[in-house]
Amino acid sequence: MKVLISPKDEFEAKAAVNGGADIIDVKNPDEGSLGANFPWIIRQVRNLVPQSIEVSATIGDFPHLPGSASLAALGAAVSGSNYVKVGLKGSKTLEEAFFLMHHVTRAVKEYDLNTKVVLAGYADYHRAETLDPFLLPEVARSAGCDVVMVDTFIKDGKRLFDFMDDACCKRFIDKGHEKDLEVALAGSIKLQDIPILKRTGADIIGIRGAACSHGDRLAGAIQAENVRALMDLAKQS
């Protein structure tokens, strides 16, 4: 299981690398759950991070604007991301979801076939008024994505496990694996959640808050020692 740590700038990225993170995921928490950062921040992080470590970038909790999403996704890929992550916020039907993600995938793959596209849905989909995440593995497969992910949209202290217990997470992972997708889980994950997440069979877990000082995803900053504690537990056999 890989651990993805989400810095907002090159200083936090350096701390994440020093802590041993598997994937460095550039985001802007001030713009939401999957808030997008600036292209030059992605480039700075890619230049800082050793080539052996993959870089991811979020492009936002996206409304149903397929053209805008495609252009943003291409921008993230050109800026050096190995993964381009799209929060499927505004697409209200399976047809809309497929249309947006198909064009995102086309934009990214025409630039670089090796860049992975991540379709991210929300465990708190009733609150976010988005699609049920269990519908998304099929959308991701049909649209040519590489990874399907579930996160939480509203960051109010509620966690992934408040909306999906470990058995539910495992069912989501199994659905993704049946479609030959990698599966990622995120959503205010704490240190004590890691052993449970390992048992679900997740390929990737995404963390920001637990890696930050005082556990604060907005006011805190990622600390190498916090990342190291997360990594040590994640890599225990």
What are these regions (language model features)?
Residues M1-S6, R43-N47, D112-N114, R171:
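N-terminal amphipathic alpha-helix/helix-capping segment at the start of soluble metabolic enzymes
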Residues K2-D22:
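N-terminal basic/disordered segments at the start of proteins
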Residues E10, G32-P50:
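Glycine-rich, positively charged N-terminal anion/phosphate-binding segment
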Residues A16, V148, L197, L230:
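Conserved, mostly hydrophobic/aromatic
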Residues P39-V45, K92-A107, I207-S237:
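C-terminal helical cap(s) of enzyme catalytic domains, especially alpha/beta-barrels
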Residues Q51-S56, G60-L160, K175-K179, Q192:
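Conserved anion-binding
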